[in-house]
A protein has these predicted regions:
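Non-catalytic, surface beta->alpha helical segment in thiol-disulfide oxidoreductase systems
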Residues: 135, 141-175
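Bacterial Sec-dependent N-terminal signal peptides
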Residues: 1-23
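N-terminal leader/targeting and pre-domain segments
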Residues: 22-75
């Protein structure tokens, strides 16, 4: 039953994407007074806001042996759903690192979907409640429409190792 609900949720989410007004919508964060992104976002949108993306992306060096092993599993994770907050320090750190891993895997960008939340864990025009998001960033890995694992907030080991463990079926339960 859980798998059916997840599949329906992803289908609904995909349907909403088709009719979404705009990616990379900006609002002012009430706490910091800075601009943040909300709703569906793209990598380009993340790269434009705040300057943190490029710095973390350039500094991160994924483990090459884990990257080599991940290349064997690429067909096993056809869809990656990332829920983040552009106001969140963990998102500033982990999301660029995740993209560095995906780039080294030459992973197609159309297989990655991102939603940015505000501090109340809400996204404009999207019901995020179906995904049980408590912390950001949350990386949801799916296989054939079913969730196979999550990396929540920060990895247990490294992003690439946690992703590898999810694909091997040996990942620890999410926190």
């Amino acid at each position: 039953m859980k798998h059916i609900i997840l599949l329906i949720s992803f289908m609904t989410f995909t349907f909403n994407i088709s009719f979404a007004q705009d990616d990379n919508q900006r609002i002012t964060d009430e706490k910091s007074g800075k601009e943040i992104l909300i709703g569906t976002v793209t990598r380009a949108g993340l790269e434009e806001i705040g300057g943190w993306f490029a710095t973390e992306y350039q500094q991160y060096q994924p483990d090459t042996s884990d990257i080599a092993l991940l290349k064997n599993f690429q067909s096993d994770f056809p869809f990656i759903f990332i829920v983040l907050g552009t106001w969140c320090g963990d998102s500033h750190e982990q999301v660029p690192r995740f993209f560095k891993i995906l780039d080294q895997l030459q992973y197609p960008s159309e297989k990655v979907f991102m939603v940015a939340l505000d501090r109340d864990k809400k996204a404009k025009d999207f019901c995020i409640g179906d995904y049980d998001i408590k912390l950001v960033p949350t990386f949801i890995i799916t296989n054939q429409g079913e969730e196979t694992g999550r990396i929540i907030e920060t990895p247990t080991e490294t992003l690439e190792r946690d992703l590898l463990n999810i694909l091997r079926g040996s990942a620890p339960a999410p926190r």
